[in-house]
Amino acid sequence: MKNVNFSSLTTLICAFTASLGLPGCIPLPNYPIEPEIEFLSFNVDDSENAVLSIHFTDGDGDLGLNQSDTLAPYCSTCDHHFNLKCEYDELRNGEWTHIPLIPAQGQVPFYYRVPRVEPSGTHPALNGTIEIAMNTWYLQSDFDTLRFRITLEDRDLHISNPDTTRFIVK
């Protein structure tokens, strides 16, 4: 009969048992139910197309819209049809000036529908990066410096903190 070292076996069993509980020891993210955003980057390629990148969190996992989300409050004429809004500002004579864009007057605002994001696992919290391809990203104007003020809205109509891009020169 082989002599078993119970001290080593006990240590091994305790270490294995403790490792089973480790995933439960990792704290779950504790994000607020309102989306939170942070501007990451704004890059323009050689074709003058731009990509806006923002980081987001959402504590209850209700971010994004399906294409079929077309009834109120998400209908095409409703205020909540778009869930990512980039308000356009220009630097005019040393002061930032908001330039409102009015669709009824044929102007196209920098508004987007971010697709629905499904939480992975059992915890609903979301954390990730949104990248928006902006084929048109500036207005024809005598002023050459702009920025975007960005907000993100979830399906419960919670609006994120606003964040602002760095200044952008056309």
Regions from the language model: what does each represent?
Residues 2-12:
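Bacterial N-terminal signal peptides that target proteins for export
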